[in-house]
UniProtKB/Swiss-Prot annotation:
It holds the Pfam family AMP-binding. This is Acetyl-coenzyme A synthetase. Acetylated. Deacetylation by the SIR2-homolog deacetylase activates the enzyme. One of its GO terms (cellular component) is cytosol. One of its GO terms (biological process) is acetyl-CoA biosynthetic process from acetate. Catalyzes the conversion of acetate into acetyl-CoA (AcCoA), an essential intermediate at the junction of anabolic and catabolic pathways. Acs undergoes a two-step reaction. In the first half reaction, Acs combines acetate with ATP to form acetyl-adenylate (AcAMP) intermediate. In the second half reaction, it can then transfer the acetyl group from AcAMP to the sulfhydryl group of CoA, forming the product AcCoA. It comes from Serratia proteamaculans (strain 568).
Length: 652
């Protein structure tokens, strides 16, 4: 592979950093040797109604998977995100909203957000929503989505946020599984200038005979085009809130009371409703936000994630608001109306901290300098990456072009199920290597194990497991604790299995190699798809690549690569040969792709994750059952890939 560059901690960052290298070592040692004391102290980042005396009560033992943190403490999430800031920063901006249309933006102060949340919480109560009831939220990226989530938390209702990109079938499935009482939606969403028919999708979802629990649909007016309207069931947000009191005391919640359910996308069969509870989750979201982004008062922070993704829960809303931060919520996409939109938003709002996904970075990288045209981006101090391993070339481009070669990049590894960051750099404490998630956060004990569960020491490669609990950990899968144990704790007994593979280098840094089901076994050699994809994307003409294995009667598996070229590049037989030789040079002959499939776009979820399950089936010619494609941002991509596959002439 290409030479690994090491980036030192910039002196401008080191000078003011909340955590330095010595402190990282001290805190980390204490956090794993004496978690009771460490987390007992860190839990004070929140305001508790009744302080906890029990900190950690967890078991990863087979048949006894139980995760409880701060279990005798009580608190309210909305009070921690809003009320406690009013005296000192009531007039400070809480949310900067940037519309899909660049001419639309607004700022919401902590005082205003508190008012709107209390008012809407009273509306929910009037509609019969009680503590413990589940409320489905299917909203565009508007401040009212945050209001709805915080209002649920204020009264002790459990929210189940559903991606605005999900189909009616997916919405119905989640409503049925969670037994949601109410749906909160909008007439339409706006994305890249196009309307998204949210209300129509809800109408279609509610036609499913399995949906029996919904009493009302609350509709926020975004575009003024509601379409079908069912009197008695459908209610306008603005009519419900008119004249309603904004006095709503926060419900006292036990630390282990459920806070939200979030369904993980892309798996076949019944959706998995990951359940997070109140206390441990918020301690972890607030603490990871503060230290990983090195957040200082007054910093403008922008996480580009949708609220329907766990990143939107933990790092667009709850982590930042618990810390009294200024958080930017963006309705649009990074390349609309022009490919320099992301850079324009940074300049317009003087963003100091940017957190986005490799898929967005690679899309901008394919446009070259057009992505930064007419912008300075000199307000940026810290940048982050989330969602999948970032290949070193994209990392370096992000670092040099977007960040002007002065901003540390926190490449964060974590999952819906972990609640917050697990392996990540700290800006003032970690030297960076492009493409590495570096070291574990406080209290996180990763290990690499072989396929029979033997822990591997030193520099090695293996299955990434976590050997003990942390406060942000999901407690169960909603209504299915057996499946929770089966999915995460049965492969390697006594350990949480992430489903990812990783390697650890001689400095103890972790490199995520991709999902373990994305590991190829070519002639007995283990190859991570992320490694081959990195090599492909380092080719100057390639924008994006996804690699899967297909059955091969001699090698076991052959390498099938889907490739999107940069703007203006065309596939040719010469390029086909050149790309195969390129990978051969970068990794070795064993990693040479057997098949290159040129395509304009890959099947992705709204959160930007490539759906490899579908790519594997298309590559193998197994098109009989592609499974659930309703979670795709653009389901038409699948038909296009199938057509391309039919017409492919594979050079020998």
């Amino acid at each position: 592979m290409s030479q690994v560059h090491k980036h030192a901690i910039p002196s401008a960052i080191a000078e003011h950093a909340l955590i330095n290298p010595t402190q990282y070592q001290q805190y980390y040692q204490q956090s794993v040797q004496d978690p009771e004391t460490f987390w007992g102290e860190q839990g004070k980042i929140l305001d508790w109604i009744k302080p906890y005396s029990r900190v950690k009560n967890t078991s990863f033992d087979p048949g006894h998977i139980s995760i409880r943190w701060f279990e005798d403490g009580t608190l309210n999430l909305a009070a921690n995100c809003l009320d406690r800031h009013l005296a000192e920063r009531g007039d400070q901006t809480a949310i900067i909203w940037e519309g899909d249309d660049p001419t639309q933006s607004k700022q919401v102060t902590y005082k205003q957000l508190h008012h709107d949340v209390c008012q809407f919480a009273n509306v929910l109560k009037k509609l019969g929503v009680k503590k413990g009831d589940v409320v489905a939220i299917y909203m565009p990226m508007v401040p009212e989505a945050a209001v709805a989530m915080l209002a649920c938390a204020r009264i002790g209702a459990v929210h189940s946020v559903i991606f605005g990109g999900f189909s009616p079938e997916a919405v119905a499935g989640r409503i049925i599984d969670s037994n949601s009482k109410l749906v909160i939606t909008a007439d339409e969403g706006l994305r890249a200038g196009r309307a998204v028919p949210l209300k129509k999708n809800v109408d279609d979802a509610l036609k499913n005979p399995g949906v029996k629990s919904i009493t009302n649909v609350v509709v926020f007016q975004r575009t003024g085009k509601p379409g079908y309207w069912q009197e008695g069931r459908d209610l306008w947000w603005h009519e419900l809130t008119a004249g309603v009191s904004a006095d709503c005391p926060p419900e006292e919640m036990n630390a282990e009371d459920p806070l939200f359910i979030l369904y993980t996308s892309g798996s076949t069969g019944k959706p998995k409703g990951v359940l997070h509870t109140t206390g441990g989750y918020l301690v972890y979201a607030a603490m990871t936000f503060k230290y990983v982004f090195d957040y200082h008062d007054g910093d403008v922070y922008w996480c580009t994630a949708d609220v329907g993704w766990v990143t939107g829960h933990s790092y667009l809303l709850y982590g930042p608001l618990a810390c009294g931060a200024i958080t930017l919520m963006f309705e649009g996409v990074p390349n609309y109306p022009g490919v320099n939109r992301l850079s324009q938003v940074i300049d317009k709002h003087q963003v100091n901290i940017l957190y986005t996904a490799p898929t967005a970075i690679r899309a901008l990288m394919a446009e070259g300098d057009k992505a930064i045209e007419g912008t300075k981006r000199d307000s940026l101090r810290i940048m982050g990456s989330v969602g999948e391993p970032i290949n070193p070339e994209a990392w370096e481009w992000y670092y040099n072009k977007i960040g002007n070669a002065k901003c540390p990049i926190v490449d964060t590894w974590w999952q819906t199920e972990t609640g917050g960051f697990m392996i990540t750099p700290l800006p003032g404490a970690t030297e960076l290597k492009a493409g590495s998630a570096t070291r574990p956060f406080f209290g996180v004990q990763p290990a690499l194990v072989d396929n029979i569960g033997t822990v591997q020491e030193g520099a090695c490669e293996g299955n990434l497991v976590i050997t003990d609990s942390w406060p942000g950990q999901a407690r169960t899968l909603f209504g299915d604790h057996d499946r929770f144990e089966q999915t995460y704790f049965s492969t390697f007994k006594g350990m949480y299995f992430s489903g990812d593979g990783a390697r650890r280098d001689e400095d103890g840094y972790y490199w995520i190699t991709g999902r373990v089901d994305d590991v190829l076994n070519v002639s007995g050699h283990r190859l991570g798809t992320a490694e081959i994809e990195s090599a492909l994307v380092s080719h100057p003409k390639i924008a994006e690549a996804a690699v899967v294995g297909i059955p091969h009667n001699i090698k076991g598996q052959a390498i099938y690569a889907y490739i999107t070229l940069n703007h203006g590049e065309e596939p040719t037989p010469e390029l086909y040969t050149e790309v195969r030789n390129w990978v051969r040079k970068e990794i070795g002959p064993i990693a040479t792709p057997d098949v290159l499939h040129w395509t304009d776009s890959l099947p992705k979820t709204r959160s930007g994750k490539i759906m490899r399950r579908i790519l594997r089936k298309i590559a193998a010619g197994d098109t009989s059952n592609l499974g659930d494609t309703s979670t795709l941002a653009d389901p038409a991509v699948v038909d296009k890939l199938l057509e391309e596959k039919q017409s492919m002439k594979v050079p020998s």
